[in-house]
């Protein structure tokens, strides 16, 4: 392992979110027809979606048997944030949502981004956003200072005029920009995501909010305890967030994370084989399931042969 503090590589980012849903067909209608993601895989009660209809996946939906209702006080998902590459791409999706009369819950200018908030069919929070150029991000004494101001929604929607045809699919450059978690304490989130996983703390939002990122991004993970301070841990079979994955750029980072999880007593429950990548699965202090994912092509045959075969589980 390297000397000095461990930092997650700058190229790290959110790979995907995996949600438990009550009705897979209804969720597919929302995420495919209304949002515009494409189905890349389906097997029994699980479907995987992406911006292109190919791997890597951006959103995975599973319909478990006898799923428990979300405990609003428990750790879990605050929202999944779908990031669009241009204002026009975001405006087109918002226009489609308005045409379908899907309810919107909020619209904010965060300085670093323009964002719309809405629920999916199960009430899971969804953010749709586009980043501003980094040169425009607000800072105070050199430190990032995200804000929450009213969004100029009319200005944004002008990017998708009424007389223009709205494409059925999202822009292929769309991805999951960040995950915002509901946690039982931001100190617990800092212990795992900063001290163990090596993400930088970009901003604290008092009371009860903190934002983590790698590579100077405004945030890849948000964590707040506004509704869940000292609440219960995440449930194993509840609706909402089943897991999420952080993409690592190379095998060295993957093996370093494996060593750190062992060192700090975070059990690796399994290695998820997605075909295109391997996800090192563990859980944070709130039992939120997290995977560290690296492309399979980054590993040598010797690397793969040296893995614990009993822990490798094929994604289905």
Say what each PLM segment does.
Residues 1-68, 74-82, 95, 223:
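An N-terminus-focused feature that recognizes amino-terminal "leader" regions
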Residues 34-40, 195-202, 262, 266:
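Conserved acetyl-CoA-binding loop of GNAT-fold acetyltransferases
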């Amino acid at each position: 392992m390297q000397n000095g503090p461990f930092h997650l590589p700058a190229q790290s980012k959110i790979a995907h979110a995996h949600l438990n849903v009550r009705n897979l067909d209804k969720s597919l209608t929302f995420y495919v027809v209304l949002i515009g993601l494409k189905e890349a895989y389906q097997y029994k009660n699980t479907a995987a979606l992406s911006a292109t209809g190919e791997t890597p996946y951006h959103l995975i939906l599973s319909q478990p048997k006898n799923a428990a209702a979300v405990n609003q006080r428990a750790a879990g998902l605050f929202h999944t944030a779908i990031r669009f590459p241009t204002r026009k791409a975001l405006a087109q999706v918002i226009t489609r949502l308005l045409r379908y009369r899907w309810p919107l819950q909020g619209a904010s200018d965060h300085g670093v981004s323009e964002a719309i908030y809405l629920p999916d069919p199960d009430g899971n929070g969804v953010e749709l956003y586009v980043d501003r150029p980094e040169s425009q991000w607000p800072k105070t004494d050199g430190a990032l200072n995200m804000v929450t101001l009213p969004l100029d929604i009319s200005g944004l929607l002008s990017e998708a005029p009424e007389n223009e045809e709205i494409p059925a699919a999202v822009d292929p450059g769309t991805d999951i920009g960040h995950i915002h978690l509901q946690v039982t304490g931001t100190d617990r989130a800092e212990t795992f995501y900063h001290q163990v996983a090596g993400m930088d703390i970009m901003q604290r939002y008092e009371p009860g909010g903190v934002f983590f990122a790698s590579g100077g991004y405004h945030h890849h993970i948000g964590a707040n305890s506004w509704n869940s301070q000292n609440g219960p841990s995440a449930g194993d079979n509840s609706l909402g967030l089943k897991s999420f994955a952080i993409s690592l750029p190379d095998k060295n980072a993957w093996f370093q994370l494996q060593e750190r999880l062992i060192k700090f007593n975070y059990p690796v429950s399994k290695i998820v084989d997605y075909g295109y990548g391997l996800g090192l699965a563990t859980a944070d202090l709130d039992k939120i399931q997290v995977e560290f994912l690296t492309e399979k092509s980054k590993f040598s045959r010797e690397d793969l042969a040296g893995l614990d075969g009993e822990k490798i589980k094929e994604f289905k």
